[in-house]
Amino acid sequence: MTVAALYDIHGNAPALAAVIGELRADPPDAVVIGGDVIAGPLPLETLELLRGLPWPVHWLRGNADRAVVMSFDGTVPPKLLEHPLYQADQWVATFIDRADRDWLDQLPPVVRLDVDGLDEVLFCHATPRSDEERITVFTPPERLAPILEQGGADLTVAGHTHRQFDLTAGGRRMVNAGSVGRPYEHGPGAYWLRLGPDVELRRTGYDTGAAVARFAAVGYPLADSILAPVDADAIARRYEDHGDEALDPSSYTGVA
């Protein structure tokens, strides 16, 4: 089986549509949607595109999906509501209904699939044990190895930190699929992963300027920052140095 892994779409329907166009030209056998699906400017359009895919789809829940559920339920701690990302999640939650909320809430944290040439692959949002733990291109093998050992797979596919990488630690491999909708990379585009029989880190171009104009037109609170150029290495370093206390990259200036 061949698999396309699409992670961290974050409600960016134009980016998703561009990737789907590539998939239609060279279809996979299945698609993995790796979490953080609708927390972004066009949540319902994004869901409509994904639910219309003609291939088997395996879904994962990400930390932003949990945040949207909490926003729908009104259970976000008041202190977190001061954060721009949680304010944006509050906005997203106004577009979904109870059925969408319940569907997001029941998505699994881990999926295992047999992939051509790669045997069993473990798919998770961040790490096998957490949907928030941050692994970056700078993560040392001694920290990564026990995390991958806990998952038990020779190959683990993840996302969460929005930057592609291919790391090995303790004889196991971890590949980050990148982010379709909000990449923290060295250039624009929609980043994703194709598996079977090899591992292919992919990037699909699309009109980011037109996308940002759409985001602003619908009133998305973070429209100006979602696709703004970033210092990819500075963000990864900050994630690595400060873990889950790192600043939100949408407000990051590139100054250490």
Predicted regions, residues:
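Hydrophobic/aromatic beta-strand patches that form the interior of the parallel beta-sheet core
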Residues: 4, 32, 58-60, 124, ...
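Acidic, His/Gly-rich catalytic cores of divalent-metal-dependent hydrolytic chemistry
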Residues: 168-256
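Glycine-rich phosphate-binding loop signature in dinucleotide/nucleotide-binding domains
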Residues: 23-27, 53, 115-117, 149-152, ...
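Active-site environment of divalent metal-dependent phosphoester hydrolases
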Residues: 10-15, 39-42, 64-69, 131, ...
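Anionic-ligand binding region
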Residues: 138-175, 180
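Core catalytic region of metal-dependent phosphoesterases/phosphodiesterases
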Residues: 2-101
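Active-site-proximal segments of metal-dependent phosphoesterases and phosphodiesterases across multiple
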Residues: 76-83, 117-150
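Beta-strand-turn-beta hairpins that frame and shape the catalytic cleft
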Residues: 1-3, 113-122, 169-173
